[in-house]
Amino acid sequence: MGETKELFPEAVELLKKLISSPSFSKEEVKTADLIQQFLEGKQVEIHRSGNNIWAFSSNYNPSLPTVWLNSHHDTVKPNLGYTKDPFSPIIDEGKLFGLGSNDAGGPLVSLIATFCHFIGKDLPFNLLLIASAEEEISGPNGIASLISHLPKADLAIVGEPTQMRLAVAEKGLLVIDAKVHGKAGHA
């Protein structure tokens, strides 16, 4: 379906488009549309629920194990301390800067490129690509809304900027809308 030489620049262009389209949690329709258009342009049959997009490898067989490739396309809102326009992707010294480039646009487009590379190949497992919404707020319309409709994951690759370190970092989530003064940050 795709060779690495073609997929890398296509993934970078998709990431630039995702960065250029604000996609705050619950407001991801534009980025969901971009992902859908990209995959359909590769003749991938997609499924969509709200702003969640998913696709199965073309040789999907329920008797084979299933590998999930999952990342999200929503972002937090930019803080006032940004030194660059967060919606204008810039490549500087080989790094692409912009809101969501690291968490988690870069991992997402990498997984999309991986999926496109392997989709037509005869694999001993199924691939399931999931581009989920509302991850930044653990929203009810994100991946949790899809779990009961998807096949069990025998293995999952989750695109998050963790430096490949496993950690228990959250036991729950409390969302409070408040106005706070000080230096902004995102963990």
Task: Cite the ranges covered by each PLM segment.
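Metal-dependent amide/peptide-bond hydrolase catalytic core
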Residues: M1-E6, D177-A187
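Histidine-centered active-site/metal-ligand motif
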Residues: H72, E170, H186-A187
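Residue-level marker for buried hydrophobic side chains located in beta-strands
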Residues: V67-L69, I157, K183
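Acidic/histidine-rich catalytic neighborhood of metal-dependent amide-processing enzymes
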Residues: L108-V175, K179
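N-terminal helical capping/dimerization or prosegment-like subdomains
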Residues: M1-P78
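Conserved hydrophobic "DFG−1" position in protein kinase catalytic cores
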Residues: A55-S57, I91, V180
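Active-site metal-coordination/substrate-binding segment of hydrolases
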Residues: L64-L128
